[in-house]
Amino acid sequence: MTLIDQLPRTPDPDALYEAFESWAGERGLTLYPHQEEALIEVVSGANVIVSTPTGSGKSMIAAGAHFAALARDEVTFYTAPIKALVSEKFFELCKIFGTENVGMLTGDASVNADAPVICCTAEVLASIALRDGKDADVGQVVMDEFHFYAEGDRGWAWQIPILELPQAQFVLMSATLGDVSFFEKDLTRRTGRPTAVVRSATRPVPLSYEYRYTPLTETLTDLLEARQAPVYIVHFTQAQAVERAQALMSINMCSRSEKEQIAELIGNFRFTTKFGRNLSRYVRHGIGVHHAGMLPKYRRLVEKLAQAGLLKVICGTDTLGVGVNVPIRTVLFTALTKYDGTRVRTLRAREFHQIAGRAGRAGFDTEGFVVAQAPEHVVENEKALAKAGDDPKKRRKVVRKKAPEGFVAWSEQTFEKLIGSEPEPLASRFRVTHTMLLSVIARPGNAFEAMRRMLEDNHEPRKQQLRHIRRAIAIYRSLLDGGIVEKLDTPDAEGRIVRLTVDLQQDFALNQPLSTFALAAFELLDPESPSYALDMVSVVESTLDDPRQILAAQQNKARGEAVAAMKADGVEYEERMERLQDITYPKPLEELLFHAYDTYRKSHPWVGDHPLSPKSVIRDMYERAMSFTELVSHYELARTEGIVLRYLASAFKALDHTVPDDLKSEDLEDLIAWLGEMVRQVDSSLLDEWEQLANPEVMTAEEAQEKADEVKPVTANARAFRVLVRNAMFRRVELAALDQVEQLGEMDAESGWDADAWGEALDKYFDEYEDLGTGPDARGPKLLLIEEEPENALWRVRQIFHDPNGDHDWGISAEVDLTASDTEGRAIVRVTDVGQL
């Protein structure tokens, strides 16, 4: 029986409340006083702002709100900041209300979009609000994690529904809202409904606070002895979190029995990367690492071990928050300051409470603990003073250690102030874009009046409003000049006095806003060109968000190589530094793409909201015949391999879906198959999550996670595996061309081809030929011979060298072990010979 079956015949507030309370009681749940207060207001039709601590049951309030909306025959929307949380809530609400009554919209996927309960990202609802305004079929909006309203890049999406959906009842929820008096008055004025603020300073699990002057290892030992684990140690960089985990390996945290349980739960889990092998050591010792730069499968393993109560300590970053499912008893701050991208500053009250609020597990703990460490130099000074005892002379002789230069200090008073401070008021992040104007112009009615109202009656200060008005006028003029909109002499049948001259439906994609530009740019490429497949990749890569860490690493690598070359050429220091300013990461087709983008933007001005960014990550990887591990190693990206994988997965999805089938050459299909299989073998969870979001009726979130943990044999995808083998062989050709015998030796020492053996073979080749080709012809299929021996689980391969004379009588012979390849998730190539045929 679902909650739908409990709906009373009429939406009487008392009947609604009693029905919901009865349903909760049947599940052994007793409503907290603040939940009762919120639900009474919701069923009466009021807007409700719920500002209660983490773990206080806001999900129950949301379910009650949806229940009330359904009773009134209204469509109710639940919004969350990230797709994973939207998906999680979708399945949760399916269990409560039945799958036929719940839908999901994420930009990537649309499932049961006509359902009366819709789970979506904030941007999706904002898009609906802009497109349909007061005529939108939205009766109620439940906004979870409403503090995202103040996020610099995304906050506008939390404001637009409030401005444009006066017909809706709003339920705004967060643990860190601060002063909400502005929203209380604003919602009432706009919707005509009373607005109730439900606060509760009382946590289901109360918190205790402590400031420590002891070294961190001593603090941690005390916490473990006091049975206050699991402890989440908060760091403000990913590097610090990993370094801490390594440093804590000297502390014995788990008994032999606990270590056996950890090993049993890990089972056959595959730690495929350098960081993964380190993580394996940490977790077997009872120490987890958790940050956004990790592969999803590693984060999921840490969460799984933590949920089983097997990790004593988790070293993580301050990003712990939305969508992170890690049970914690104690939060230990290593600092109360952070670098925000511009400067080092003290934590804001909202940031502090967002992290501290994770301490204490409802249903498990009777108390949570929040501990902050004094700065290291203060700890050392306290230790020296304690050693001096009460002797005044000894205390005067203590040489106090100074803070590092430029250090931003914090103290016990800082800690106490943060504890007692309310989160800062939420700041408006309204913005004007081409998409906003086009959406408003497309809706029925007077677009000028609608835009004037939105621009003059938003949450911005007047000075900012004037700036937005000027921006809107400039955008409108560009649309008019470009022929995208036209003014009408008389209003049309739906009251428009300005209308669009183009159909926006095919041009608007929340997840890939530049995909239509890519389709136009494909037409500029020559299908007969040897570089056609890679040029298609470059077009798609230019439309993707920049992976900043990868691009910075590419630039650093390029500059390092340039400096070495200039030094070898005797270039003076000043000139070297001057030349370096012009060296950046690779940007294939830059001139062609920017020229095409400028032309395309004249007739599609809304793409101006999304700048083009040529780059070469996939192309660079493919041209160098690199595996994922080699890419991470080459650019020293071990700490951000999760970000690398996320970019590769996004590129695969874009290539797979953006490029029309009739434009996919055989080489491009090979490349796409290789990329998809590589992503799956490293960590399939990103692609599985994508497939699950697109087809939730086929696969639940839990099944998607189970699927992600089950690695398919790499040889099962024959096309992709053939490309993996080709790349593995050609990687050796590239290194041979550069005479990198040390790297070749590292790759092939186990099969008897160390650096000396490679050096001897290549000396013979270069005695005969001046050069070894690595261009498109060199990596063509004609120069790779594969003889399959399935009965022996073996392939015999021969990579022929592309010599300058075209003799093609030298090459590399190797065996590919299919069984070992499936075990490792990559092509296991064993060189057997390098020489003449």
For each feature predicted by the language model, list its residue ranges.
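Conserved two-lobed SF2 helicase motor
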Residues: 114-130, 285-296, 305-325
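Non-catalytic terminal extensions of ATP-dependent helicases
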Residues: 288, 307-308, 391-798
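Compact beta-sheet-dominated globular domain cores
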Residues: 802-837
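Helicase-associated low-complexity/disordered flanking segments
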Residues: 1-48, 255-284
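Conserved interdomain hinge at the start of the Helicase C-terminal
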Residues: 212-236, 243-246, 300-308
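Conserved P-loop/Walker A NTP-binding site and adjacent catalytic elements of P-loop NTPases
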Residues: 21-24, 29-205, 212, 230-235, ...
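Conserved segment of the helicase C-terminal RecA-like domain
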Residues: 330-333, 337-339, 345-386
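Conserved C-terminal RecA-like helicase domain
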Residues: 79, 87, 94-103, 238-313, ...
